[in-house]
UniProtKB/Swiss-Prot annotation:
The modification N-acetylalanine is found at A2. This is Retinaldehyde dehydrogenase 3. It holds the Pfam family Aldedh. Homotetramer. Transmembrane segments: none annotated.
Amino acid sequence: MATANGAVENGQPDGKPPALPRPIRNLEVKFTKIFINNDWHEPKSGRKFATYNPSTLEKICEVEEGDKPDVDKAVEAAQAAFQRGSPWRRLDALSRGQLLHQLADLIERDRAILATLETMDTGKPFLHAFFVDLEGCIKTFRYFAGWADKIQGRTIPTDDNVMCFTRHEPIGVCGAITPWNFPLLMLAWKLAPALCCGNTVVLKPAEQTPLTALYLASLIKEVGFPPGVVNIVPGFGPTVGAAISSHPQINKIAFTGSTEVGKLVKEAASRSNLKRVTLELGGRNPCIVCADADLDLAVECAHQGVFFNQGQCCTAASRVFVEEQVYGEFVRRSVEFAKKRPVGDPFDAKTEQGPQIDQKQFDKILELIESGKKEGAKLECGGSAMEDRGLFIKPTVFSDVTDNMRIAKEEIFGPVQPILKFKNLEEVIKRANSTDYGLTAAVFTKNLDKALKLASALESGTVWVNCYNAFYAQAPFGGFKMSGNGRELGEYALAEYTEVKTVTIKLDEKNP
C-alpha cells in the first residue's frame, strides 16, 4: 500500500504503476438506497439525508436514511443467510475465496468510478483515492480470498483414549461501522476477513461518506454473493450505529472511529449480548527523529505522516520528537516541505491536500491552531484557512511545542505538525508513552540497537522504523491502551471472526 517514504506500491505484475485516469467529473450517483438481501430498499421512516462535496460545499445527492427497523430487517436477512443448509453455509471455502477474488476483479474494473466517488464524498485528492485507497482495498480482498480455504484446526494429543481436535467456525452475524476518512478501505478491512471466515455482515458507513459503500453493494450483488450475506444500512450513529451495537442477534462488531464513540459501542455490546468487539480508535502518535537519522528521509516521512489525507488519519504523526542536535535543521526543512505542499482542487492530479471533511472538523482544527499560538508555540507557517476556498486549511507547522500544550495532547485530525525537542532516549521514551493512546509510533535512526530499543519500549500497536504509514494486508494493525482492542489485517484478523470449537471423541483404544 505505502512504501517507506509514503509513496504507493501499485501491486501490478510487471511492477509498473497503472496510469492515473481522468476522474469522472460529472459522475451520476446511481446507488443511494438501503441494501438488504441483495435488493435496494427505502427506509421504513421514508427519511433521506444529504451528502455534500467538501470541496465545493455543494450537495451531491440524497441518501435513504436507515433507522432501527431497517437494521432489524438487515439482521433478519443476515441470520437467514447464515442458517445451516443455506446457500452461503453450503458454499465450500475455496468458492468463498473465489467470490472475494471476483469482487476484487470488479473493484479493479470500476476503480476510476470508485476513486471518483471517494473524492467527491471525502474531498481527498483523486491521486490518493486511486493509488492508495483503491489499491489497499483490492489487495485486502485478494489477501483474505487466499485465506478462505486455509483456516484450519489442530489435532491435540491427550492423556486418555480420545481423539481431540479443534474447529474454527464463523461467528455468525457481524456488525461493522466504518469511518469517513477512509470509507472504502476501512470497509474492506472489516468485510474481507468476515466473509473469508464464512460470516454474514450488517454494515453502517459513515453518514458523511456513504457513496462508495453503496456502490460496492452493487458489485457484491453482481459477483453473486447469496442474498443476505452483506447488508448495508446508511444512517446516523445514534440510530443505525446504536442499533447495530446493541442488537442481540449480532454476535460481533468491528468499529473504526473516535475513542469516545468506541466506548459507547463497547458499552452497548456488553449490555446487550456480550458480543465480541474490535475497536480501532484514536491516537497521539509519536514520531521520533534521532540525531543520527537520515534527515532527508525523516523530514519527508514525518511530513507525509501528518499531512497525508489532510491530516485526517488516526495514524498521523501528531507529535514529532526531534533530538536537539538536529532540531533546528529539521524544523527548517519541514517548513520548506509544508510551504510547497500543493493544496487545492482534489480532482487536479497535482493536488496533494484537499479540504477537511466538514465544517465541524474545520472549526475544531482552527481552534486548536489558535490554542497553539496562545500557549506559546512558534507558528512557522500556515496557521489559517485558505482564502476564499471553503474548508481548506494551510499546511501548518509549529516549533517550540511542549508536552502540556493542547496541540501536543489532543487529537487534531488536521494538517498541523507540532515539533518537539528531546535530549536523550530515556527522556523521549517516557514522553512518547505519556498518553492514554497507543496506536502507532515511528523511529528514525541509522543505529539498529537504538531502533530495537525504541521499538521495544514504545507502547504502540505498530512501530515503523525509517518509514511511515507502511501498511500491508499481511501485517496486523491495532492499538494499545485507549487506541482500541483486537487486530485487523493479517492472519491475526481471522481470530476476530471465528470461534474455536473443541471436539473430543471417546475411543475404545488409543491409537499410537
